Regions:
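Histidine-acidic metal/acid-base catalytic patches
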Residues: 1-13, 17-30, 144-161, 171-332
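Acidic (Asp/Glu)-rich catalytic clusters
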Residues: 1-3, 25-34, 46-65, 77-91, ...
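N-terminal capping/interface segment
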Residues: 1-39, 64, 71-78, 87, ...
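Acidic-and-aromatic substrate-binding clefts and catalytic sites of carbohydrate-active enzymes
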Residues: 14-21, 38-52, 69-78, 101-111, ...
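Active-site acidic/histidine proton-transfer and metal-coordination neighborhood
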Residues: 62, 71-165, 171-172
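Hydrophobic faces of well-ordered beta-strands that scaffold small-molecule active sites
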Residues: 2-13, 38-42, 61-68, 94-96, ...
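Conserved, mostly hydrophobic/aromatic
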Residues: 31, 40, 56, 86, ...
Length: 332
């Protein structure tokens, strides 16, 4: 049982999306001065690699994980390139967000996802940076039951299966009929094949936790039927799906809904469950948790509350519960 590292997405080192862009040095300085983080998460663009290396060394904040999104049929070489960049920074993992549709426009198959992952894993094992497939909207894994299906395919070929869990993408779909129509998961729910609510026995998050698939985790709070982001639109005119709920009570005018911290209970329960599993189970695969309050359209675009402060306070809460949980299991 190892202590968990707690980090922050570089995309979340910003107060609001209306602020002037920050230099990378300023972002690293903010993260370091908060004393809340052990690392930061990012795959640097090629032209910024030297500046990232300088800031990592200056502020003693390593890049323990990279992240990128990929379209199969187009980005296989980019995937390997980003794993290589991660290895040069000492990143343990690289979070791969694989889009739901192939370059040819068809939905990606489980076999295609498995082959993509295995190719990255074979390369990553040689260079020291391992891929984790992320549970995420707009990706193949938004059809949540497919995660276990791909895992079985990968394991049957003798490979270890690793995921990045971002359970905000599960919690916001609870009591959310519109979101449950995507990939027809409402039918899986009605048939009893898929349980989203972490308070219910056999829920999908508990299944993934017990499987030890989860090696990396993203922490960004949401609530059931999370309010949509009415202050931001996609290019097609649709408003943000709403996959972020403030962890810290916003000041008046910073958020359009009445904030209720009690509604965070389901999201917090999953964090506590995975931390409990980690410190009670020597077989736990989890190594690190990245806070990921961010500003894109489906998340925090247009809001007045501080994205960075939510990352800091969430990280401090996670640190607190990990310390309490560790002591509980040591004393028992």
């Amino acid at each position: 049982m190892n202590d968990l590292f707690i980090g922050c997405s570089v995309f979340g080192i910003i107060h609001t999306d209306s602020d002037s862009p920050l230099t990378l040095e300023k972002q690293f300085s903010m993260a370091a001065e908060s004393e809340a983080f052990d690392y930061v998460e990012k795959t640097p663009p090629l032209e910024e690699i030297d500046e990232y290396k300088r800031c990592c060394e200056k502020f003693k904040l390593p890049l323990r994980c990279g992240i990128w999104f990929y379209t199969l049929g187009k980005d296989e070489d980019l995937f390997l390139q980003n794993l290589k960049i991660g290895s040069e920074f000492g990143s343990v993992y690289h979070t791969a967000q694989d889009m739901a549709h192939h370059e040819d426009g068809q939905l990606v198959t489980n076999e295609e996802i498995g082959n993509f992952y295995i190719a990255g894993l074979n390369y990553g094992e040689k260079i020291g940076c391992l891929p984790c497939l992320e549970v995420h909207v707009n990706m193949w894994s938004e059809d949540f039951l497919r995660v276990e299906q791909v895992a079985q395919m990968v394991q049957e070929q003798g490979y270890k299966f690793r995921i990045t869990l971002d359970h905000s993408h599960i919690i916001f779909k609870i009591d959310n009929p519109e979101e449950q129509k995507i990939f027809d998961i409402d039918k899986d729910i009605n048939d009893g094949k898929l349980i989203l609510d972490p308070y219910e026995e056999g829920n999908i998050c508990d299944q993934w936790i017990k499987s030890n698939f989860i090696h990396h985790m993203h922490a960004r709070s949401t609530i059931p039927n999370n309010p949509k982001n009415i202050h931001a639109q996609h290019p097609d005119g649709s408003i943000g799906r709403g996959i972020q709920y403030p962890f810290v009570k916003p000041l008046p005018g910073q958020y359009h809904e009445k904030w209720d911290g009690k509604l965070l209970d389901r999201w917090k329960l999953v964090v506590q469950s995975i931390v409990d599993h980690h410190y009670s189970n020597k077989g736990s695969s989890l190594e690190q948790i990245t806070t990921e309050f961010i500003t894109p359209t489906d998340y925090g675009a247009g809001w007045g509350y501080s994205i960075f402060n939510n990352n800091v306070q969430c990280a401090k809460w996670i640190r607190q519960i990990t310390n309490e949980t560790k002591l509980k299991f040591i004393n028992n």
